[in-house]
């Protein structure tokens, strides 16, 4: 069976692609026409009492933000920086090449001996 061949079940809406030869039928709108009647306006508008809706505060926190995190400070360069995911120390290089190293404890260097 090739493309565009129908196996029953109704008329394909893709006839415009495969050349059915018929124009698509326009959709029929069965919605009632809007009423032109107007509601009477009372001279004494009564105040409507609206119950206050309780809002769940936890639903207002964006995904990925932990409200009890100790690293919850505002960053100028965006929310997805720093140790927001792993709470591990940064691996960013803080010293210039050839300068002091924070890895002296591994390589036995440094110290004032």
From Swiss-Prot:
Protein function: Acts redundantly with SPR1 in maintaining the cortical microtubules organization essential for anisotropic cell growth.
A biological-process GO annotation: cortical microtubule organization
Composition bias, Gly residues: 1-12, 97-113
Location of the region described as Disordered in the Swiss-Prot/TrEMBL record: 1-50, 79-113
Listed GO CC annotations: microtubule
UniProt biased composition (Low complexity): 23-34
UniProt keyword Iron, yes or no: no
Tissues in which the UniProt entry reports expression: Detected in pollen of mature flowers.
Listed InterPro entries: SPR1/2/3/4/5
Keyword terms: Microtubule, Phosphoprotein
Phosphoserine PTM positions: 69
Keyword Lyase: no
Record-given protein name: Protein SPIRAL1-like 1
Family statement drawn from the similarity comment of this UniProt entry: Belongs to the SPIRAL1 family.
């Amino acid at each position: 069976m090739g493309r565009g061949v129908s196996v029953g079940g109704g008329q394909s809406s893709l006839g415009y692609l495969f050349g059915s030869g018929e124009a698509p039928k326009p959709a029929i709108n069965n919605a009632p026409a809007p009423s032109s009647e107007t509601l009477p306006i009372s001279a004494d508008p009564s105040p409507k009492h609206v119950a206050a809706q309780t809002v769940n505060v936890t639903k207002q926190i964006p995904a990925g933000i932990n409200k009890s995190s100790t690293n919850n400070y505002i960053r100028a360069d965006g929310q997805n920086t720093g140790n927001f995911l792993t709470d591990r120390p940064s691996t960013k290089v803080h010293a210039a090449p050839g300068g002091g190293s924070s890895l002296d404890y591994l390589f036995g260097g440094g110290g004032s001996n």
